[in-house]
Amino acid sequence: MSTINYDLTRIKALAFDVDGVLSANVIPLHPSGEPMRTVNVKDGYAIQLAVKKGLRIAIITGGRSDVVRKRFIGLGVSDLYFGSAVKIHDYRGFRDKYGLTDEEILYMGDDVPDMEVMRECGLPCCPKDAVPEVKAIEIGRAHV
């Protein structure tokens, strides 16, 4: 077990990338050519529970999948930033919309497009298979 050197009681919002964070790193293709996503049921349970507990949740992704959008809407997430070319802009919009400070936001990303947000948020986290550049920034790392 690892220790996160951060006062978790300060966290009021969670923001996530999708591909590689809330879905597998491998995206199978449907015969039609459309990418198919897999999701973790436990992640979904945790997200809907966080929403019920009053945490603000944002999804900030470069992807544009309607299926993924429906999944998060079904979990109670209303702050969805799809097709995010420069994630820091959407992160700041989310933060400012709710009058949050960077220190009140946990962000989980796994790849280079997430790095700018991870440098700005209060608690940058990543999955264990994140790229090395992201691992150099993170404070908390998932063990799965």
Give residue spans per PLM region.
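Acidic, Mg2+-coordinating phosphoryl-transfer loop and its flanking beta/alpha structural elements
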Residues: L106-G140
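Conserved Lys-Pro-Asp/Glu-containing loop-to-beta segment of HAD-superfamily phosphomonoesterases
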Residues: I88-M115
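Short beta-strand/loop segments at the ligand-binding rim of alpha/beta enzyme cores
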Residues: K53-A58, K97-I105, G122-L123
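Conserved small/polar residues in nucleotide/adenosyl-binding loops
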Residues: A142-V144
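Short hydrophobic/aromatic-enriched beta-strand-loop microsegments
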Residues: V77-A85, P124-K128
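Active-site neighborhood of HAD-like aspartate-dependent phosphohydrolases
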Residues: M1-R56
